[in-house]
Amino acid sequence: MKPVFLDFEQPIAELTNKIDELRFVQDESAVDISDEIHRLQKKSNDLTKSIFSKLTPAQISQVSRHPQRPYTLDYIDALFTDFEELHGDRHFADDHAIVGGLARFNGQSVVVVGHQKGRDTKEKIRRNFGMPRPEGYRKALRLMKTAEKFGLPVMTFIDTPGAYPGIGAEERGQSEAIGKNLYELTRLRVPVLCTVIGEGGSGGALAVAVGDYVNMLQYSTYSVISPEGCASILWKTAEKAADAAQALGITADRLQKLDLVDTVIKEPLGGAHRDFGQTMKNVKAVLEKQLHEAQSIPLADLLSRRFDRIMAYGKFSEQ
């Protein structure tokens, strides 16, 4: 797959194109230009490190939405075995913006749930661009209650612009579905591990992101509203999105400092989409450690700790 570069990555794109051209020349002729290719490759890596070491919140927001980032089904394929997808909320329909089912993680049975976006136009429409309707959240809850019934840990992957705001979704109880999930997740009697892998958009993300551990990939975001949406409300123009992103505190590092996130999972140089394999290794290592910790804690203590964690949201001290 040909890499897609964001606006601020154009200097990297130019170097990458030069490297590709030189590789083509080397393949088609007897001229040895491998040293020049290596020099440009090192220059490209150094430039990428330089650019990504000083990303603004607005730029991180762009990376979190990168069209080539791994989605939930990519993580399921890489981290789990024997995945059996389950469909429908048993009330209205099957929402393809939420995927989930039974699987094995390191041989242990678990339930996995997550948002799913599409790669091409047809799939994006089918997945509703990763924006669940009420039936998606009710499907997620059905799967999590199944996990509770059989004593299976729950692992969720969050990547959504937000819950779908359509009229039909509102008529079918979008806010009720989200609120019900929040309530049930606070008292679910099994370990719950949540990982933000891309966009963590408002209540649409929170409905599957209440757990014993909340992780974020290094270049993912988590906020009550998108920077563009916030700018449109406050300044009446999306051109102020960069200012909004800064004010919202949407980045993983910022949220970890506020004790809203447990672990920031390091991404490969250039973002998760640059190296799926390394991204999966990094995520797996964190989930393995957290699952072991959660299962070593007595259930009553686990639930008490989860409740205390939620009650601590929003606390602050004046200095």
From Swiss-Prot:
Q: Which class of enzymes does this protein belong to?
A: transferase
**GO cellular component terms, semicolon-separated:** acetyl-CoA carboxylase complex
Query: Which reaction equations make up its catalytic activity?
Result: N(6)-carboxybiotinyl-L-lysyl-[protein] + acetyl-CoA = N(6)-biotinyl-L-lysyl-[protein] + malonyl-CoA
> Which intervals hold domain CoA carboxyltransferase C-terminal?
39-293
Q: Which Pfam families match?
A: ACCA (PF03255)
Q: What is its EC number?
A: 2.1.3.15
Which Gene3D superfamilies does the record associate with it?
2-enoyl-CoA Hydratase, Chain A, domain 1
Q: Which PANTHER family match?
A: ACETYL-COENZYME A CARBOXYLASE CARBOXYL TRANSFERASE SUBUNIT ALPHA, ACETYL-COENZYME A CARBOXYLASE CARBOXYL TRANSFERASE SUBUNIT ALPHA, CHLOROPLASTIC
Query: Which family does the similarity line name?
Result: Belongs to the AccA family.
Q: What is this protein called?
A: Acetyl-coenzyme A carboxylase carboxyl transferase subunit alpha
State the species of origin. Neisseria gonorrhoeae (strain ATCC 700825 / FA 1090)
